[in-house]
C-alpha cells in the first residue's frame, strides 16, 4: 500500500526550539544541478533579535560552567553526529553534488574537529593565562574569559566549515547566533545540538539572506563579537565592520580559510577577554 510522502520541514533553531520565521517567509533550496531539495525558513530581523535574546539569556549559565563540562558537551555533540554519519553524508552529497565517499570524508572531518576542540576546553586557559612578574608584594594573575554573544556569518562549507566556526566560539564559553549559507545541513546539525547536552540558546541558527541579517546583527548593541568568515561581498563586510565599531565589538574577518588544515588556537582566542587580578602576597 502506497503512503503519503512526509517531507521534512526546515525551520529556525532559536533558544533550543524550532520555530518558523515570525514573518512566515520561506525560500527554495536547490541542488547544484538546480533540482528542488526543500523549502527553508527565511529569518527576519525580529527572528535575529529573538536569537540574540536567547543567546544572552544562555550566556551566564554556559560561561559559568566548568571548562571540563563544556568539553564533555562538545564531545557528546560529536557522539550524536557520529551516530548520524550516513544521513549527513547523503544530505551533503545531494546538496553539493559530490560523491558519497567525499561527503563521508567531510562528515568524518567535522566529527574529528569537534573532538579536537572538546579536548582543548580545559587547556586553553593554561595556554592563555599567565602569572605576571610585578614589582611589589603582589600576585598578578591574568586569565581568559569569554567575550559574550558572538554573531557568526557561516562559510559556504556546509558542515566542516560550519563546525569550525561554531565549536571554537562555544568551547570557550561564548554563546552565538549563526547565519547559515547552507540551510539544510545547518538545521539538521541543529537537531543534533538539540538532542545533545547543549543548553538551549547557546547556539542559535538562522537561515535566510545574509545581506538582510548581517548588518543588523553587526549593529546590535547586545552582540559582543562578529565573525565575518562567510561574507564574500567586500562591501557588505565593510558595512558590518563599520556597524560593529559602534559598541567596539571584536571582529574577525579572515582570508579564505582551508578548513582541512590544522585549525590552531586563533579562533578560540579571538573571542576571549583577559581579566587581570592583583592580590597581596602577604599580610
What role is predicted for each listed range?
Residues 1-40, 72, 76, 108-112, ...:
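Terminal low-complexity tails and localization/encapsulation signals of metabolic enzymes
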Residues 33-123:
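Glycine-rich loop-to-alpha-helix module at the N-terminal edge of alpha/beta enzyme cores
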Residues 102, 138, 212-213:
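Short acidic active-site motifs
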Residues 119, 127-196:
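Conserved small-residue-rich beta-alpha loop and adjacent elements
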Residues 153, 172, 179-180, 206-208, ...:
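Generic beta-strand/beta-sheet core signal
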Residues 167-170, 216, 243:
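Hydrophobic/aromatic ligand-binding patch that stacks against planar heteroaromatic rings
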Residues 202-203:
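Nucleotide-activated donor-binding/catalytic signature segment of Leloir-type glycosyltransferases, i.e.
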Residues 207-229:
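A charged, well-structured terminal subsegment
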Amino acid at each position: 500500500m502506497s503512503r503519503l510522502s512526509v517531507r521534512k520541514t526546515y525551520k529556525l533553531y532559536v533558544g533550543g526550539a524550532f520555530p518558523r520565521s515570525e514573518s512566515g517567509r520561506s525560500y527554495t533550496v536547490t541542488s547544484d544541478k538546480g533540482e528542488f531539495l526543500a523549502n527553508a525558513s527565511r529569518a527576519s530581523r525580529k527572528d535575529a533579535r529573538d536569537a540574540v535574546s536567547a543567546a544572552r539569556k544562555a550566556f551566564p549559565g554556559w560561561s559559568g560552567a566548568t571548562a571540563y563540562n563544556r568539553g564533555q558537551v562538545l564531545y557528546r555533540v560529536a557522539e550524536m553526529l557520529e551516530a548520524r554519519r550516513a544521513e549527513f553524508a547523503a544530505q551533503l552529497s545531494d546538496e553539493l553534488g559530490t560523491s558519497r565517499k567525499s561527503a563521508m570524508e567531510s562528515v568524518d572531518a567535522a566529527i574529528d574537529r569537534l573532538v579536537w576542540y572538546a579536548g582543548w576546553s580545559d587547556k586553553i586557559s593554561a595556554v592563555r593565562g599567565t602569572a605576571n612578574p610585578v614589582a611589589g608584594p603582589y600576585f598578578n594573575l591574568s586569565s581568559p574569559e569569554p567575550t559574550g554573544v558572538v554573531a557568526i556569518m557561516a562559510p559556504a562549507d556546509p558542515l566542516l566549515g560550519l563546525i569550525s566556526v561554531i565549536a571554537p566560539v562555544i568551547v570557550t564559553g561564548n554563546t552565538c547566533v549563526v547565519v547559515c549559507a547552507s540551510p539544510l545541513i545547518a538545521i539538521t546539525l541543529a537537531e543534533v545540538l538539540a538532542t545533545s547536552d547543549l543548553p538551549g540558546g547557546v547556539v542559535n541558527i538562522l537561515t535566510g539572506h545574509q545581506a538582510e541579517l548581517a548588518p543588523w546583527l553587526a549593529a546590535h548593541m547586545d552582540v559582543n563579537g562578529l565573525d565575518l568568515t562567510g561574507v564574500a561581498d567586500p562591501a557588505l563586510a565593510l558595512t558590518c565592520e563599520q556597524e560593529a565599531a559602534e559598541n567596539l565589538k571584536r571582529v574577525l574577518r579572515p582570508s579564505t580559510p582551508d578548513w582541512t588544515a590544522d585549525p590552531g588556537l586563533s579562533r578560540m582566542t579571538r573571542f576571549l577577554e583577559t581579566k587581570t587580578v592583583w592580590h597581596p602576597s602577604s599580610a
